[in-house]
Amino acid sequence: AALNRLGIQHPNLHVFSESEMLPAASQGAIGIEVCNTNMQPGILEILSNINCQETFKATRIEREIVAALEGSCLSPISALGTITNQTLYLQVRVSNQDGSNTIEKECVFSMADEESALKKFKDGLIKCGAKELIQS
């Protein structure tokens, strides 16, 4: 995006599609943290006005996947959640450390069924060996 804004084109530039390179969990989302002590009046109201609830929910779910697999920001885990009309489309890809073996899973569920559907999805990832794969 920055290269486009600056009008810079490079012959060796390739924009990856999500099918080629799924992003890490919460990649590209901006998080703002505030200190409870000494907070200026109105800060929470301002932040609530710029918070996108769908992005907030999707990134929380992406991070839940990483946590379920006992991963970290250094783990080879990609997760992308997209919420449209209260329906989540979740794509997850995990690999071993050198990327030679991968597991890819996706699911679609209503946000009304989030808790049970997400638990079933996380359990399925674990059952197919995703935890072990990221450690190998």
Question: What is each model feature region?
Answer:
Residues 1-136:
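Small-molecule-sensing regulatory modules
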